[in-house]
Amino acid sequence: MRNSIKIFALIFFNISLSQGVVGAWERYEITESGKQKQVVIFSDKFQAISIYDANTGKFIYSNGGTWKLNGNTMTEKVEFDTGNPERVGTEVSFEIKLNENTLEVVNAGSKWKRIDNGTPGDLNGAWLMSGRYRNGVKQTRRTDGPRKTMKLLSGTRFQWIAYNTETKQFMGTGGGTYSTVNGVYKENIEFFSRDDSKAGLKLEFDYEIIDGDWNHKGFSSKGDPLHEIWSRRK
């Protein structure tokens, strides 16, 4: 009976700790090239970190993939890494310290301040692009292959990433803040790897959840009309 209680308590502790990680975190670092802003977003199973110039939005670095927590040890499996593609498919483990508003990576000596805990945005979690409409015709795409376009959202932050886990290729990323109010999804772009001049751009879309999928309609950062379909990543 005591062993059962201990096991239950350990499971409950791990679940509580994992739920505490979910959301968005940030830190700043002063380097020779200027002030860097670093943001990491955690959903229940997936995470992504972005690093960019805090003043200009110039993109610097990103990596991400899956994560799990065992006690205070976090293990991440890398799905993309803009600085070192050979890390794709590998796992890295490290000790963390967590409280309500601070996440510390012990060996790295880095401390992150909480931005949000996964609220209040309606779309928090990990999504994969699963289709789009072209000239009114719906086109679907597989989400179980190595080529992925993933969008990771906390309660207030978003990041999209296009990559291939098989070839280890990184195709692009962008991110910033978002809000969802009365069926309107608004983005404030803070970085965009393909074109740094997009930083500061504000975009507005209509959104609707249909059969569990996120329908995303409006105009792209290039001004082209779009209607994308995103499915929750499991």
PLM features: residue spans?
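Bacterial Sec-dependent N-terminal signal peptides
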Residues: 1-24
